[in-house]
């Protein structure tokens, strides 16, 4: 024959009742219908309880928060949790037989007035809601309107200031660009003469020779002769003055620096008229023959 739901087969083939465990304990494995002969008692796992003797397993504890109720007693291994009344703004429906549901549901405007708990909670909510006096409401509205007006006015003034600022800078930039274009156009139409574009080297050389003129070496009797070239005629950018076709040759003393400046100066305009001039080197000095003409008596 077959064993019952609380029996197992022993080693002699007989049906034996499963072991019973006390409160807070359960069998380590299911026992019944001929199986579970080697099961033993063990403690209930967390969130489960067993309040009586038997071979049945531990049961799950109830969670009061899930059913919207206040928890009065916590769950233990030997007892279930105890839930109290419904949470605020919740109520339990009453069945036809007078029994109430375990779960609480929210209170709404459609809740029957017979539910005392909902009526009490709604009255508490209405009592807790503060009423604002009409004068204070008017004052709040006025202050809010003024704040909005001031904010809009500030934004408008800021926008106008930014617009004027950008326009001023744009006009100034356009005027500067126009003047630069006009100057470039004038320079392209009226180029600067090459004679005015002097280099720094030529300017320095001219300054040197203008401040330190060369004195020609002439005989005393020749320097006093009328019609002969004087010292002013030799104050040039080189050791020689401009040559003229009606002058005769006469030696003038020049240094090597004078010849170097004379050969490299671009502003000297009489370089091509030297023609038959000759340079003689005697010792540590150089002599240049410059033609000049002695006027006839």
From Swiss-Prot:
Transmembrane segments: 139-159
Sample GO molecular function, one term: tumor necrosis factor receptor activity
Stretches forming TNFR-Cys repeats: 2-41, 43-83, 85-118
Bias-annotated ranges (Polar residues): 272-281
Keyword Cell division: no
Region Disordered: start-end pairs: 272-297
Annotated glycan sites: 74
GO cellular component, one term: plasma membrane
GO terms (BP aspect): cytokine-mediated signaling pathway; ectodermal cell differentiation; epidermis development; intrinsic apoptotic signaling pathway by p53 class mediator; positive regulation of canonical NF-kappaB signal transduction; positive regulation of JNK cascade
Membrane topology summary: Single-pass type III membrane protein
Highest rank taxon of the organism: Eukaryota
Extracellular topology ranges: 1-138
PROSITE patterns in UniProt: TNFR_NGFR_1, TNFR_NGFR_2
CDD domains per the UniProt record, alphabetical: TNFRSF27
Keywords: Developmental protein, Differentiation, Disulfide bond, Glycoprotein, Membrane, Receptor, Repeat, Transmembrane, Transmembrane helix
Cysteine pairings via disulfide bonds: 3-15, 18-31, 21-41, 44-58, 61-75, 64-83, 86-104, 107-118
Positions on the Cytoplasmic side per record topology: 160-297
Subcellular location: Membrane
Quaternary organization: Associates with TRAF1, TRAF3 and TRAF6.
Biological function: Receptor for EDA isoform A2, but not for EDA isoform A1. Mediates the activation of the NF-kappa-B and JNK pathways. Activation seems to be mediated by binding to TRAF3 and TRAF6.
Protein name: Tumor necrosis factor receptor superfamily member 27
Species the sequence originates in: Homo sapiens (Human)
Lineage, uppermost ranks: Eukaryota, Metazoa, Chordata, Craniata, Vertebrata
Gene: EDA2R
